[in-house]
From Swiss-Prot:
Subcellular location(s) of the protein: Cell membrane
Species classification: Bacteria, Pseudomonadati, Pseudomonadota, Alphaproteobacteria, Hyphomicrobiales
Top EC class, one word: lyase
UniProt entry tagged with the keyword Membrane: yes
Gene that this sequence comes from: psd
Disulfide bonds: none
Protein name: Phosphatidylserine decarboxylase proenzyme
Cofactor field: pyruvate
Length: 232
């Protein structure tokens, strides 16, 4: 491996969704510096933070169709059994809900938790209250994604937070998706809820830190193991 390749591999990629924000922050830094030089450094700090926010690191993703992987980086804030939101069309039976809160320092790239087919995409406008509040799933701006997997339907809800002002979802209805595939992001602080059939055995708890594509939320087969991984 050449020195240039080594240097290139040491840098975490930046997602293209962040380019306009990074450029805007840097231009503002230059303008502020022209007005008063110390302000340039304040703007530069915000620019560096913006670069960090939109980082898009590759992950080591286990290839096991019986495992449900975390769809987001962040802290697990809720784990409970409840009836999923009616808007998802998942019926009235209880499912396991796991909520993952992403603060402004988390990587905000969202990933598919289990392989399957995208059955529906459901966007709902709403408020921008603190995403840590339980009721944020009912009142905040949100985007629902329902995946038909071999273990049944699984619902994912991207929820905008206090500072988030746009939910991005790249997946489309009828798309075939695989575990760990990038499907969207939420800008500047947010939450992601995932609804899973109760047959799944939990492997996480409230307060735990999750890593998208790498943390196993639960399994549909306790004896299932994997030795295969994908780097993406």
């Amino acid at each position: 491996m050449s020195i240039l390749q080594s240097v290139h591999n040491s840098f975490v990629p930046i997602h293209k969704e962040g380019y306009p924000f990074i450029v805007a922050f840097f231009v503002i830094s230059l303008i502020l510096g022209w007005i008063w030089s110390p302000l340039f450094w304040c703007g530069l700090i915000l620019t560096v933070w913006c670069i960090y926010f939109f980082r898009d690191p590759d992950r080591v993703i286990p290839l096991n169709s019986n495992w449900v992987m975390s769809p987001a980086d962040g802290r697990i804030s809720f784990v409970e059994s409840c009836v999923p939101p009616e808007e998802l069309g998942l019926g009235k039976d209880e499912m396991i809900r796991i909520s993952i809160f992403m603060d402004i320092f988390s990587c905000h790239i969202n990933r598919i938790p289990i392989s399957g087919t995208v059955e529906s995409i459901l966007y709902h406008p709403g408020r921008f209250t603190n995403a840590e509040f339980d009721k944020a799933s009912q009142f905040n701006e949100r985007n629902g994604v329902v995946i038909e997997s071999k273990h049944g339907k699984i619902g994912i809800v991207q929820i905008a937070g206090m500072f988030a002002r746009r939910i991005v979802c790249w997946s489309k209805e009828n798309d075939a998706v695989i575990t760990g595939e990038r499907f969207g992001l939420i800008r500047f602080g947010s939450r992601l809820d995932i609804y899973i059939p109760t047959e799944m055995k939990l492997r996480v708890a409230v307060g735990q830190t999750a890593i998208a594509g790498e943390t196993v939320l639960g399994s549909f087969d306790d004896k299932s193991a994997t030795t295969d991984f994908r780097y993406d």
